[in-house]
Amino acid sequence: MTELHWMTASAAARAIAAKELSPVELMTALLARIERLDPRLNAFIHLDAAAAMEAARSAEVEASAGRLRGPLHGVPVGIKDIMDVAGLPTTCHSKILKDNVATSDAVCVSKLRSAGAIVLGKLSTHEFAIGGPSFDLPWPPARNPWNTDHHPGGSSSGSGAGVAAGLFAMALGSDTGGSVRNPASCCGIVGIKPTYGLVSRRGVFPLAFTLDHVGPMTRTVADNALMLEVLAGHDPGDPGSVAVVHRRYAEGLERDIRGLRVGFIRHFHEVDMPADPEVTAALEHVARTLQLEGAEVRDIHLPTLVEFGAVNRVILQSEAWAIHAPWLRERPGDYGQLARRRILAGAFFSAGDYVQAQRRRLELIAAVDAALGEVDVLLCASSMDPACRIDNPADVERTYSRQARTPFNITGHPALAMMAGVSVGGLPLSVQFVGRNFAEATLFQVARAWERAAGTDRKHPAIV
């Protein structure tokens, strides 16, 4: 039998529904693993162990009586600490909000609870989802379970580290410039940035209003699809939310991909930002594997990463400055150095800069839409390198921008990152799949074809 800490959320939910697994048994195993490993990983800012165990007992009583709340009944979940959980701190990993306690759940948290999931606690993040990894804050940064000397990616760092290490099977992350997909890439898990507007952001502390997304982080494609089914839906309380027909993303995952058209954006990692040779080789292997699975793979071109990056920088930092300006004027010393520097940069962009960036953004959206008119899915790099050491500021800064994730925050298209292999140094390599707006089902289908062929869902760090 699979060890409980490596059990998928889908399998755990099925076992609980069939009365083959007790929610208390699962919670006990995970809390023991958290107690043993988290002092090295720092995935949690606030572990709510007593409340989680009480919720597991209630879930067990309900399951015994055949009363299941939903498809995640009794399954533990971790929440990134920029998302409100009633009665728990929402600190955003910052001194600014260290005493802030939420009075209600974020909509994404409420949806998970309604589906039966049990909140374990709040997870480490880069400060305000932009600064980090930082050592000048009240809480230490999360570390990579594949090698704790290395960065787990960010800003959803605790989410990535905890899922990869088997502390929980699923977590919530947010993605404004790649913050779900970066930890997914560094930690070898599955993370999706859904289509802009598909998942409500109400109750989530904003970084940049027009770029923010909420997304699921899991060890398998099936779990990610199931979690997104729960999270998706229109919320009138989020001005960016879009009303679309609800999809059952977990259905059809095992369909073959014969005839599916995949556009390979080679120039991202070969020309625009030359990748580590191991990353390049891994991406070529993914492309060949999809061809063997029946997909039609061909090269496709988009505007350069430099163009996408320039637009993202102006919009993200301008919008972040608009949010943080009052605190930065009154309490600059309460910010960590990295967050302060990155947000302050937004003060130097003019209204004209912002308008021009938004104008160019429309052209970039049209370019990606046109590419996806020729193919069904795009394949490209996520990170250009394996995870860097966490204690080397120069490496952290260098790898911060060596990625191909921000284009799809700019355009809003759904983008999924997952493991593409393991480096000679024992760290995950990654791939990114991008789809048409609200075509997450196709994205999951392609990701599952790769996962099934490569067995990435069975590769875990050796941390014990």
Name these PLM-found stretches.
Residues 30, 52, 74, 80, ...:
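Conserved hydrophobic/aromatic pocket- or pore-lining residues that grip, position, or stack substrates
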Residues 36, 110, 114, 164-268, ...:
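Structural helix-boundary/capping segments
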Residues 11-17, 31, 61, 258, ...:
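Serine-dependent amide/ester hydrolase catalytic core
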Residues 23-28, 57, 248, 277-300, ...:
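Acyltransferase
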Residues 72-214, 321, 380-396, 461-462:
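Short glycine/serine-rich loop/turn segments
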Residues 72-92, 251-266, 315-365, 369, ...:
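Short helix-loop capping/hinge segments that flank enzyme active sites or metal/cofactor-binding pockets
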Residues 12-18, 97-101, 212-219, 344-349, ...:
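Short, well-ordered beta-strand elements within core beta-sheets of diverse protein domains
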Residues 1-54, 292-294, 353, 459-464:
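An N-terminal boundary/leader segment
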